[in-house]
A protein has these predicted regions:
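A short acidic, Gly/Pro-enriched loop at the edge of an enzyme's catalytic core
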Residues: 104-111
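A short glycine-rich, Lys/Arg-flanked "PGG" loop and its adjoining helix->strand segment in the class I
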Residues: 126-138
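Conserved class I S-adenosyl-L-methionine
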Residues: 1-40, 55
Length: 225
């Protein structure tokens, strides 16, 4: 899909996005916790790519109350929801932009992303990783908590069947599942191994996958000092 089509998908589902997400991410508490735990406690400048409605942003604020957060998203309706959550906080900057096109904030202690980058084609992921590396301070880190693809077609099918079983067990309705599958038209998920290789190729050090449950993973890399 084009950027405009992508924006339309997320604008259309913004109102129900948060309600649905908790039932559509098996093990969501461990997934988000793993991402938060990787960020150094003294991080003072954190940028979030694809902040959406601010669901992960509010967790960042709770974990890092003194840090300045820059929340970046290209969906105006999603960012409006984030402002409702965090709009009174003077240490939060809301940026309506496409993070794959426009410059990222510089000298960040950490750049994080949650369930966003998997919408990009592989080459755009690789280009973005280079931009992220340049935007970090030496020693800064990038954390990507994302929806990933299986390493082969057989495991991808297993992932999908497990996801359907898990979300139904969590109480997701068939409408919520249908809406999620509609959003997944936008997905361009990539396997963990490929993404870790691209991070190393971009120049990141200490690259690893720190959490994985089926098709959800948390990956991290550090800009060398």
């Amino acid at each position: 899909m084009s950027t405009n089509q992508s924006r339309t998908v997320f604008d259309a589902t913004a109102a129900t996005y948060d309600r649905d997400r908790m039932k559509l991410i098996p093990g969501h508490e461990a997934f988000y916790a793993a991402a938060l735990e990787l960020i150094p406690t003294d991080a003072m400048s954190i940028a979030e790519l694809g902040a959406g409605s601010g669901l992960f942003s509010i967790m960042l604020r709770a974990a890092f109350p003194e840090a300045h957060l820059t929340l970046i998203d290209f969906s105006e309706k999603m960012l409006e929801l984030a402002k409702e959550r965090l709009g009174d906080d003077s240490r939060v900057t809301f940026t309506l932009t496409d993070y794959t096109i426009d410059p990222l904030p510089r000298n960040c202690d950490a750049i994080v992303s949650s369930l966003s980058i998997h919408h990009l084609e592989d080459e755009r992921k690789r280009t973005l990783l280079r931009s992220i590396l340049e935007a970090l301070k030496p020693g800064g880190l990038f954390v990507n908590a994302d929806h990933i693809a299986g390493p082969n077609a057989e495991l991808e099918e297993v992932y999908q069947l497990r996801w359907l079983a898990d979300v139904r067990a969590l109480g997701a309705t068939e409408q919520q599942i249908s809406d999620s599958l509609y959003r997944q038209q936008e997905d361009r998920r990539s396997p963990v191994a490929a993404q870790l290789a691209w991070m190393r190729e971009a120049g990141f050090a200490d690259v690893d996958c720190w959490y994985k449950y089926s098709s959800f993973a948390v990956m991290c890399g550090v800009r060398p000092r």
